[in-house]
């Protein structure tokens, strides 16, 4: 076996060291962020009693800091976005990779990736102007700024991530898997749902996790289409979050 020249071994050592230092620095910066957040947030837990912090009233100007409405509102909106985006995103990825003709795939793939780059402020404005009135008419609510509207916008924002990564995971499944299933008498749909998707399960789960992470981390669009008021949603019939008061809007802006 031919031995590597010392010059190549030295270059390999440098590259390996740089990669290792990059990974360690990423972990170090994340730890610094966590320490900074803990240091800045610790006084809040000392000044505000836990029973007030986990209360149901959020009026910071009047001294009420209950975060339960904020948590429940975020959970409701995220669950709605996941329910809407995951089935649609997976079905679209299957269509693009397994069903659509080549020329359709060449059009849809770049278009979906472009949609992922639309700023959240633009999507929030479109949701406020276009989607909210439609939801208001459909639900018969006093306003279209509802949890459902927020879920629709978050689902739209998570879809490009779920579709793109799921499509890549499905494309990575070896062609021999498909040929073997078809040779055993499986139909095209049976091959997709019982062979291809299970084989791409890890990539699909990663796509869902990244899409959900995008939905959870979004703030601006949700604030614009849900009314920016911290009130408790009380079910599908009253999915309205409501419109923030003037003082609440001023406080949230500050």
Stretches with model-predicted labels:
Residues 70, 74, 110-113, 117, ...:
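Residue-level signal for discrete positions within transmembrane alpha-helices
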Residues 28-31, 74, 78, 82-90, ...:
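Hydrophobic positions within alpha-helical transmembrane segments of bacterial inner-membrane proteins
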Residues 119, 184-185, 198:
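Glycine/proline-centered hinge or cleavage motifs at structural transition points of membrane proteins
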Residues 4-7, 80-112, 133:
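Transmembrane-helix boundary motif in ABC transporter permease subunits
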Residues 2-18, 38-81, 101-105, 249:
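Periplasmic/extracellular loop-to-transmembrane helix junction in inner-membrane transport proteins
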Residues 165-166, 170, 188-226:
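Transmembrane alpha-helices
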Residues 113-151, 155-158:
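Generic hydrophobic transmembrane alpha-helix motif, especially the helices
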Residues 215-249:
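Glycine-rich helix-loop "coupling/hinge" segments at transmembrane-helix boundaries
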